[in-house]
């Protein structure tokens, strides 16, 4: 039996993506949770974005912020408007020295290979937009 890419025993299908940026963890965190940064990777919020609260975006993403540890990570429910399932997204900030940080996206509880492929394309596009925005800021 061949193992399917991204299939786990415990959390269904997953997709992960990470990239190192020439920023401190605090700089990376501050950008990703600024209005511009949130707009890129999460969308334009139509609600407050707070721990243990539901959120929604103009793009039709909704969920609940479950864990929020500044300069470390966020874990939240994440659902597209067209989906029947609630998935989980975790964004981590990992220091690689004083001025380098890995920004890591892990998307769990995807329903299958098709949803994983959709999210692979989605998060790669988001990472490209994050990179372009940071490059434009001189980072």
Where are these regions (language model features)?
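Hydrophobic ligand-binding cavity/cleft-lining segments
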Residues: 1-46
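Tryptophan-centric aromatic hotspots in well-structured domains and transmembrane helices
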Residues: 29-32, 41, 78, 122-123, ...
């Amino acid at each position: 039996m061949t193992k399917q890419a991204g299939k786990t025993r415990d959390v269904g299908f997953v997709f992960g993506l990470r990239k190192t940026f020439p920023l401190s963890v605090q700089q990376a965190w501050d950008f990703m949770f600024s209005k511009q940064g949130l707009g890129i990777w999460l969308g334009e919020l139509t609600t407050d974005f707070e721990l243990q609260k539901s959120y929604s975006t103009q793009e039709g993403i909704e969920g609940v912020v479950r864990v929020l540890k500044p300069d470390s990570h966020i874990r939240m429910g994440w659902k597209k408007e067209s989906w029947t399932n609630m998935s989980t997204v975790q964004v981590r900030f990992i220091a690689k020295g004083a001025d380098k940080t890995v920004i890591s996206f892990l998307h769990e509880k995807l329903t299958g290979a098709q949803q994983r492929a959709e999210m692979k394309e989605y998060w790669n596009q988001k990472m490209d937009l994050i990179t372009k925005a940071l490059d434009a800021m001189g980072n």
